[in-house]
């Protein structure tokens, strides 16, 4: 079935990047549950995204599926939302709600008057739409998959 094939493809991709099988399994169950009513067959890959949103020091690849848009963020050393994406969005800080999973590298997310948090490989994260900033930590590219907020991020 389509949901099973989609989940298998997603599992293989994430498993090649993350070794925590419980987290990978949970993400795939989410996808399976979301698409259990689908009758048609859809398989997409980030190697051939529907859209690429490019900005200084990074890019955001988008694949569109019925009822869901999934994004893959790739940010390079020195990337910071308020410097690199803010000029494109017209807001000082990110106001997009996120649900995703860190694949590689590390990034900090910071809200005003709250302790910053670091997201790394294997972390399943939720970030509210309260204005926040984010930046790459270290020298490695930060890569994450986004299941919520992808339709409007950096658009």
Model-derived features: positions:
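A short, N-terminal "cap"/entry segment at the start of jelly-roll beta-barrel domains
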Residues: 27, 31-74, 82
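Short, charged/polar surface micro-motifs in flexible loops or helix N-caps
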Residues: 68, 76-82, 104-107, 153
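N-terminal amphipathic/basic-hydrophobic helices that include classical n-h-c signal peptides
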Residues: 1-37
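Short, conserved beta-strand element in jelly-roll/cupin
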Residues: 92-108
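Short acidic-glycine-tyrosine-enriched beta hairpin
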Residues: 113-129
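Conserved short histidine dyad/triad with adjacent acidic residue
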Residues: 72-93
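Ligand-binding loop in jelly-roll beta-barrel domains
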Residues: 129-153
